[in-house]
Curated annotation (Swiss-Prot):
Applications: Ergot alkaloids are known for their toxic effects on humans who consume contaminated grains or livestock that graze on grasses harboring ergot alkaloid-producing fungi. Due to their strong affinity for monoamine neurotransmitter receptors they may also have clinical uses such as treatment of migraines, Parkinson's disease and cerebrovascular insufficiency.
Classification via InterPro entries: BBE, FAD-bd_PCMH, FAD-bd_PCMH-like_sf, FAD-bd_PCMH_sub2, FAD-linked_Oxidoreductase, Oxid_FAD_bind_N
This protein's record includes keyword rRNA-binding: no
The protein's name: FAD-linked oxidoreductase easE
Induction of its expression: The expression of the ergot alkaloid synthesis cluster which leads to the synthesis of fumigaclavines is positively regulated by the brlA and stuA transcription factors.
Family matches, as SUPFAM superfamilies: FAD-binding/transporter-associated domain-like
Broad enzyme group: oxidoreductase
Protein family according to the UniProt entry: Belongs to the oxygen-dependent FAD-linked oxidoreductase family.
GO annotation, biological process: fumigaclavine C biosynthetic process
Known pathway: Alkaloid biosynthesis; ergot alkaloid biosynthesis
Task of the protein: FAD binding oxidoreductase; part of the gene cluster that mediates the biosynthesis of fumiclavanine C, a fungal ergot alkaloid. DmaW catalyzes the first step of ergot alkaloid biosynthesis by condensing dimethylallyl diphosphate (DMAP) and tryptophan to form 4-dimethylallyl-L-tryptophan. The second step is catalyzed by the methyltransferase easF that methylates 4-dimethylallyl-L-tryptophan in the presence of S-adenosyl-L-methionine, resulting in the formation of 4-dimethylallyl-L-abrine.
Length: 628
């Protein structure tokens, strides 16, 4: 109850300022300097006044559409002294105003609470200052706003998103789009911003035989999901009804947001049925103008192409995505692991090289797998390989696979473990629950593709093992692969494979992902971890294959200096043209996204000179010729 009273008091105090304001500086939202065109920063430096105006305007013009404005605060703000504002508590309010603000503040508390499986504190703090507090920080610690958006519109329908988008466009607000906030590069947060939160849009609709708008071709069974549906919710529905989709390993990730629009990789299913974007049949999108459009091969094909790999929060807000479903068939899973001292050369030249050789051999037989490397201590590491024989529950074949694996590993003289099980459904092999992580645990990530040419070469497995032998990893770090090749690279010329992903994806055998832990919740530790990831670990990952520099944007280096080329390559030129067509004023902004080079680092100022953008455009044109 005390939290609610404090929250109401905060919101109520903010409204007092309304009486002293005739009109906020909405009509003059842009200021000019020698180097940039910026949002009106003075507006954001008095958030209590702006909050009052926003609540009033939402109450008067938006509440009739059911849009609720929420005040978003740090995870630990309810337990600590907030530095967001220093407002007086003397005022008078009507009962209806109190009711509105109680609802608003309760929403804000719920949306800001951290969860053990969402290590998001890294992108609440600033790059150089500890600007927010955490649930387990000292009780007397001050709480600041950090990179948490100031306000959030918790939407439940498409028309509510339209209202919120037009509101942001009209008042030139720095806009952030969020579903689960499951992002390791801070794309769903932003200082001094206005957030559209789509997590309540939970519609799931199955189609026996989907036909896209404007088409007379039946595309087979499919499922349409709302912007707030998670992979776990979709997996559960599919397990009940007998189908699966290509999705990631973490069930708390959103199904239609950044995961899908950034490409969508499965550790094993992509090898069989392609990337998630290869399976998209249609999007429903709210554009920067607030219009609703349907995008598929027949309607608005340009933005349909861009949304299949160009990244979330960039071209519009996807309110519904329709994708192919696949039979929830049986699968046999084989698991093998080796471990030993990190300085034991045999572990790398025989054990881990052996695992990569096994993976290569099984890939050539049409069986995908995932390699995982994790430290057990400062001196010991564990390497494991999980293989998925899909569309079979033949225990005899599984036993034969195990025997071939055993023969390879016994020749290494290293200790190993081996196990196998057959499951009636693929969905039984998918994770049901989220990661439960230590208190204040945060992560950042990096990734790189490995080409089929390298992986399938005679020296490929040994080369990978030797590259990883000296790869620096902390006690909570993790390195894992996602199996590409197969149907990711097959039939490249087919229309449904024409996505905006970097063309290198169609030439890759595996994606290597590195998860770098940030265990101490301070801006200093965050900055140190980011710099080490960028300057040390990512450099070593790119050195695996210097002439094949392609990365996965969804798990990319937050400090990536060549984003346009490593994420999109020759496709960037066309993506930028589509961005300018559908969002000419850059209402939608995504960190290291298409067009982001035109903005300053804090995302509040737009550079007057587009030299950097022109350079990226030129590099993309050159790359187009190389990949032809």
């Amino acid at each position: 109850m005390s939290h609610r009273i404090l929250c109401v008091a905060f919101c109520v105090c903010s409204l007092v300022a309304v009486s002293s304001i005739y009109s906020p500086p909405f009509n003059h939202p842009i200021v000019y300097s020698n180097n940039a065109i910026c949002f009106q920063l003075s507006t954001w430096r008095i958030p209590q006044l702006y909050l009052a105006v926003l609540i009033r305007r939402f109450d008067l013009s938006l509440s009739t559409r059911g849009v609720m404005l929420a005040v978003t605060v740090g995870v630990g703000s309810s337990q600590h002294h907030s530095q967001r504002s220093g407002l007086s508590l003397t005022f008078a309010m009507t009962p209806s105003m109190i009711t509105l603000l109680v609802k608003t503040c309760v929403i804000s508390q719920r949306t800001a609470v951290g969860e053990p499986h969402r290590p998001g504190w890294v992108w609440e703090v600033g790059r150089t200052e500890d600007e927010t507090c955490h649930a387990h920080s000292p009780r007397g610690a001050p709480c600041h706003q950090g990179r948490i958006p100031l306000y959030s519109a918790a939407v439940e329908s498409v028309d509510q998103i339209q209202v919120a988008v037009r509101f942001a466009q009209r008042h030139r607000l720095r806009l952030v789009v969020r579903n689960t906030g499951h992002d390791t590069a801070g794309r769903s947060s932003g200082s001094d911003s206005f957030q559209i939160h789509c997590h309540r849009m939970k519609q799931i609709e199955y189609h026996d035989n989907f036909r896209a708008l404007g088409s007379d071709i039946d595309r087979g069974p499919a499922v349409s999901v709302g912007a707030g549906v998670t992979l776990g919710e979709m997996y559960a529905r599919g397990a009940r009804d007998g189908w699966v989709v290509v999705g990631g390993e973490c069930p708390t990730v959103g199904a239609a947001g950044g995961f899908l629009q950034g490409g969508g990789v499965s550790s094993f299913h992509s090898f069989i049925d392609g990337l998630a974007v290869d399976n998209v049949l249609e999007f429903e999108v709210v554009t920067a103008k607030g219009d609703v459009v349907v995008a598929n091969d027949h309607q608005n094909p340009d933005i349909f192409w861009a949304l299949r790999g160009g990244g979330g929060g960039t071209f519009g807000i996807v309110t519904r995505a329709t994708m192919r479903v696949h039979l929830n068939s049986p699968v046999c899973v084989s698991e093998v692991a080796v471990s030993g001292l990190r300085n034991n050369s045999l572990l790398w030249t025989k054990g881990i090289t052996g695992l990569f050789s096994i993976l290569r051999s099984f890939n050539q037989q049409g069986i995908p797998g995932q390699f995982i490397l994790r430290p057990l201590s400062k001196d010991q590491v564990n390497a494991s390989l999980t293989l998925y024989s899909l569309n079979t529950d033949d225990t005899r074949r599984s036993a034969e696979n195990m025997l071939s694996i055993r023969n390879i590993l016994e020749s290494t003289t290293l200790p190993f473990t081996l196990a196998s099980r057959c499951l009636p459904k693929i969905s039984d092999a998918l994770r049901k629950g989220p990661d439960m992580l230590p208190v204040n645990y945060g992560i950042i990530t990096g990734s790189v593709l490995v080409s089929e040419d390298l992986f399938n070469s005679e020296e490929g497995p040994l080369h990978l093992a030797k590259q990883l032998e000296h790869f620096p990893m902390g006690p909570m770090d993790l390195l894992f692969t996602s199996n590409l090749g197969g149907n990711v690279s097959a039939n490249t010329g087919k229309k449904h494979r024409d996505t905006s992903m970097h063309p290198g994806w169609r030439q890759a055998a595996h994606l290597i992902n590195f998860v770098r832990s940030v265990s101490t919740p301070t801006a200093h530790e965050k900055a140190r971890s980011l710099e080490e990831l960028h300057s040390v670990q990512m450099r070593q990952l790119y050195d695996i294959e210097p002439d094949f520099r392609v990365s996965y944007r969804n798990l990319g280096d937050p400090l990536e200096s060549d984003a346009a080329q490593v994420y999109w390559g020759p496709n960037y030129k066309r993506l930028l043209e589509i961005k300018r067509k559908w969002d000419p004023e850059d209402l939608f902004f995504s960190q290291l996204g298409v067009g982001s080079e035109g903005w300053t680092e804090d995302q509040m100022c737009k550079r007057q000179q587009r030299l950097q953008q022109m350079l990226q455009y030129l590099m993309s044109s050159i790359a187009q010729r190389v990949y032809r």
